[in-house]
Design a protein with these regions (language model features):
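Conserved ABC ATPase "signature" region
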Residues: 64-82
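Conserved ABC ATPase "signature" C-loop
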Residues: 165-166
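Conserved catalytic motifs of ABC-family nucleotide-binding domains
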Residues: 107
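Catalytic Walker B motif of ABC-type/P-loop ATPase nucleotide-binding domains
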Residues: 111-114
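Helix-to-loop junction immediately C-terminal to a conserved catalytic motif
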Residues: 3
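Conserved ABC transporter NBD signature motif
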Residues: 11-19, 28
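Conserved ABC ATPase signature
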Residues: 86-90, 94
Length: 222
């Protein structure tokens, strides 16, 4: 729906306040960047620089503009020193960031990221999410993150939407989602680590901080 490959049967999908059905495909592509779940599917060129420059060149931007936008995208994702590297030799996490850089080079207002933290270790995952948080807070880019990693959702998302069998079953904050009032397992989701551990100790907690505080209180009470 976001990419206008399908049109909604009811309601609207708005991008920059405009219904997507009113956009020409090329104009919508300027507004939205998409990063695949499998980063290898987006690798088309022989250097990191050329990979990120692929989109701007397809739009026939000037060489100076391409150089500027690619440099900014590589800097934003921590890949500036790898501009001449062969993309397929990058680590999995670096390939993820390369996909984000390629999308950023077109200056989108919205980024759609499909399972962007899958297959990453804790350090790479943290680094990636901090990059995305910076893009959102400093550049005002809307991040739409498709994820089954509930720890990432709990920690970084401002709004959580849960779909089950194609239907909307939840739309609200992560704190409310994992606060104990909703049976997220019934929706096929795993509770964040803090919430799952809290359940074993007989109380609820939406964050690690809340879990530690309640556990200490429980211990003090004997």
């Amino acid at each position: 729906l976001f990419m206008a490959l399908l049109h909604p049967r009811s309601g609207q999908v708005l991008v920059d306040g405009e219904d997507i059905v009113n956009y020409e495909p090329a104009d919508l592509a300027d507004k939205i960047g998409y990063v695949f779940q499998n980063p290898d599917l987006q690798i088309l060129e022989d250097t990191v620089f050329d990979e990120v420059a692929y989109g701007p060149r397809a739009k026939k931007l000037t060489a100076e503009t391409i150089k500027k936008q690619v440099a900014a995208a590589l800097a934003a994702t921590g890949l500036a020193e790898l501009a001449d590297a062969y993309p397929r030799l990058l680590s999995f996490g670096q390939k993820r960031r390369l996909g984000v850089a390629s999308a950023l080079a077109l200056n989108p207002r919205t980024l759609i990221l499909d399972e962007i933290t899958n297959g990453q270790d804790a350090i790479e995952k943290e680094r990636m999410m901090r990059y995305l948080q910076t893009l959102n807070e400093d550049k005002g880019i809307t991040i739409v993150l498709i994820s089954h990693d509930m720890d990432v959702v709990r920690r970084y998302a401002k709004r959580a939407i849960v779909l089950k069998d194609g239907c909307l079953v939840y739309d609200g904050t992560p704190t409310e989602l994992f606060g104990g009032a909703h049976d997220v397992e019934e929706w096929g989701l795993r509770r964040p680590t803090a919430a799952a551990l809290a359940g074993r100790f007989g109380f609820t907690a939406a964050t690690p901080e809340e879990f530690c505080s309640k556990l200490q209180r429980k211990g003090a009470e004997g």
